Amino acid sequence: GLVGSEMCIRDRYIIAKSVPFKPNFTKLATLLDMNRNTVSDLMCYLEKAGIINQLRAETEGVRLLGKVDKVYLNNTNLAYALSDNTPDIGNVRETFFFSTLRVVCPVTTSEVADFTVGGYTFEVGGKNKSQKQVHDVENAYVVKDDIEYGMRNVVPLWAFGFLY
């Protein structure tokens, strides 16, 4: 189980190397040599402890309790601290966006982009990210890294840091 610091460190390391990912608790349970329900509990504990954030679909009721669409580290510092190599910059961008917005409003998954926040759709990427993915989506924005200012439906990623 979860007793012993070696097991907890190994579990966090496996999760840290995999984020963001669409969780399959059954496969995680096999990988971690645990019961599936224990993995589900572990993920909740890691979220409460500020290690991870779980991105959920915009659902209501009992379905919301079990439906996690993606798991991210709680913040970008953890990505660098827990990784052997430089973390994927796309993952770092998404982690930054999600971790800064989730403290001020609910963030859910989007069927066409990365995130939905209060009826607005956001696609996160680098300075060369195109509008193609959200071109026909109402209230959609492209959040770009490595730009100084935005225009129309393009917002610089750094601007979301002011929300935190």
Where are these regions (language model features)?
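Short, structured coil segments at secondary-structure junctions
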Residues: 3, 117, 136-138
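Accessory nucleic acid-recognition modules appended to NTPase machines
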Residues: 1, 5-6, 10-113
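Structural signal for conserved beta-strand scaffold positions within catalytic alpha/beta enzyme cores
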Residues: 53-54, 73, 123, 142-144
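Conserved catalytic cores of phosphodiester-cleaving nucleases, focusing on short active-site segments
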Residues: 97, 101, 115-130
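Catalytic cores of nucleic-acid endonucleases
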Residues: 105, 110-112, 125-164
